[in-house]
Amino acid sequence: EFRRVLFRSQVMAQKLLIRDLTLRDGQQSSFATRMTQQQIDRVLPFYKDANFYAMEVWGGAVPDSVMRYLNENPWDRLEKIKAVVGNVSKLTALSRGRNLFGYAPYTDEIIEGFCRNSIESGLGIMRIFDALNDVNNVKSTIKYVKKYGGIADCAVCYTIDPKYPKLGLLDKLKGKKNPEPVFTNAYFLDKAKQMAALGADMVTIKDMSGLIQPSRIAELIPLFKQNLSIPVDFHTHCTPGYGLGAVLMAIIKGVDIVDTNIWNFAGGTGAPAIELVYIFCKKLGVELDVNMEAVAKINKELYGIRKELEAVDASKQFPNPFNPLTDQLPAEIDKEFDKAIEAAKANNEEALLNACHAIEAYFNFPKPNELVKKAEVPGGMYSNMVAQLKQLNSMDILEKAMELIPTVRLAAGLPPLVTPTSQIVGAQAVNCALDIKAGKPMYSNVSNQFVNLVKGEYGKTPVPVDPEFRLKIAGTREEIPYDTSKYQMQPNPELLEAGGVKLAANEKEVLLLELFPQVAKNFLTKQKVAAYEAQHKADAPQAEKVVAEEKKNEPITGKTVKAPMPGSILRFTVKPGDTVTKGQTVVILEAMKMENSIATDYAGTVKRLLVKEGTTVAADAPMIEIEA
């Protein structure tokens, strides 16, 4: 307890601390989370000298991506960073409350094992959020993070009320009203207070979509500082153009910690650059205890790494080279920094944003995304919807899908638009627009996740769901919370192809299997088989291979169940020889992070499964052969 009190007073006494996001949120926002361990190893010696208060290196999409795309072990990633950085910076991970890094609510036993292993592997701070801001969903993680000596950083997810259509005179005469605002300053403070009461060591205002305007953060920071006795961190993005101005405003209003990226990974869909924050702090007389010489060395290395990541670079627009320690600012740009400070102090938002945009334009950071700004939805949600519609050759209904977001969101209980609820609402808005286009009633096609959200399995929504709507979507009027007592552990079979070893050999591997069932299964199988083959070097008998090939190329004679959209086969719910009825779910297809139950249009007997679980399939690809 003394250590925790000391931590609080140490943070509260500092002028401004920096949480560097480059190796997690930075690479996830701009480069599809594709940094390899070898690339990370190149910057770690400089990070050891940089003296950031904290470094976000784990969680979010990192554990999934390193297994799925890089064939690397997520636990190794955390342990290798800790081995080099030591105790210079606190290593941070982002965790989704009861869902941890996965998408299902887990039992306390799994949450405890996960927190213990994370902290033993080098984690210092767990940033915990819940997509619904349901405080009950973060309770267990707070408890176990603290039990094993970690720091619990609880995030309040910032979101805004939908833009409802303007009501005409006739609507008003009929007594129609738009819903009252839900996401008020009092709402966010109440969530922060509840988290503090549960033992949060710090609170983050987490704006994942960059939609918080400087004028709003100017209200929230003083409100939090006056009513909470723990440090306040501010996290935002630059996508719609508010990020830099909002961070400057937060610093002026007395925030304890801000989240930044290093220059070549900053701006655009990412967070603001530490180098710009450094200039503002110098002008404001705010102490910033970061070694900017080490930061410049990291940035030089990041330039080369970004070149290597060109194929997955979201903007392909490099900022102009700049080192605040050695490069002189032109007088007119130096003046823009002064104008921004002056405007922030005077609460003149328009002038503040104009100055910040002039600074970003001079350094060639990406321009504000006007579509995201206008639609007021997260950039990731918007790009997911576009990708979904492109795959379905239905870009003509994008506008309709965007229009339907407030309707779908309100019907589902007004969830904040953050992962995973932003994807659930976005995918459902697309489904509804497709229903309308096909002349079907809205909600004819719903994802499993949308059903679970409406049912209550994700937790309490900010406003209650209409029982009649719940009945229509989920088959029940009553809210049914997820019952973790019914949770079933993932199977952990012996791998015959790897000499009979267990798929997951230890607790850390078991946890990977629980959090990422299909991805971890593929990764661990590959690892175990490769290790076994390296030891035994024996080829499989040729005859067996020939038989397997012949079977694979056998022509399809029965009816087939085809993929209605591109996606990945999560699991089959039937096996060869099973009898199926028309309309029965036979396969679960993951598309755009949503699980879709695919039914057969035919009754009969399953002859064979035409693809393996984990396979990526195109639209119209046959998945199952059925003999009628």
Model-flagged regions — what are they?
Residues G59-D190, G210:
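Active-site beta->alpha loop and helix N-cap motifs at the rims of alpha/beta catalytic domains
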Residues P240-K253:
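Catalytic cores of alpha/beta
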Residues K48-V66, E342, A346-P555:
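Terminal or standalone catalytic/regulatory effector modules within metabolic enzymes
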Residues Q39-A61, R116-I125, L198-G199:
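Catalytic domains of carbohydrate-active enzymes, especially glycoside hydrolases
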